[in-house]
Amino acid sequence: ISFSRGLRYIMQDMKEVQPTIFVTVPLMLEKFHARIVKKISAKTAGSAIFKFGKSASMVGRAFGSKSIGRKLFNEVIETFGGKLRLIVTGASALDPRVAEDFMTMGIDLYIGYGLTETSPIVMVNNDRLMLTDSVGTPLPNIEAKIHNPDDLGVGEIWVRGPMVMQGYYKNPEATAEVIT
């Protein structure tokens, strides 16, 4: 486990540490993505090569191979230390196009959902369900449902399981205010 010295040092620290797994928030991924796209677009025919590479990588992923993306986008992977194979993110929504681009580079991406009161993960996608526009399915022993969904399926997320907060430690008054 390693922690960066600060925002301005993240890329330098990643090259030094060479992580295989990177846990971050969507905003950081979007910033990295913008820099990657800008760098690729600055090259002659960079955008066309990027589109071709994405297409070839997606075909490879459909057949269970991530190596095509890793080879085609090796230069990008090297900026993250060269060994990055998995990014785990959550805490806010991630642009599905950003998720797709990282996945086509041969990097798996797990997007999760949770709350402080649920210690914190409730749902996450995984090897079998790696969607770019979803936080996946509930973890084992967790039940989740959309309460009173509207016509579009939008409603409040209700969660039940052993990881849900039982109350505030030694503070029954505060507990009574939030849990009925």
Language model features by range: what are they?
Residues 1-3, 25-29, 46-49, 112-114, ...:
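Glycine-rich loops and low-complexity Gly/Arg-rich segments
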Residues 7-8, 26-27, 47, 53, ...:
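Alpha-helix N-cap/helix-start capping motif
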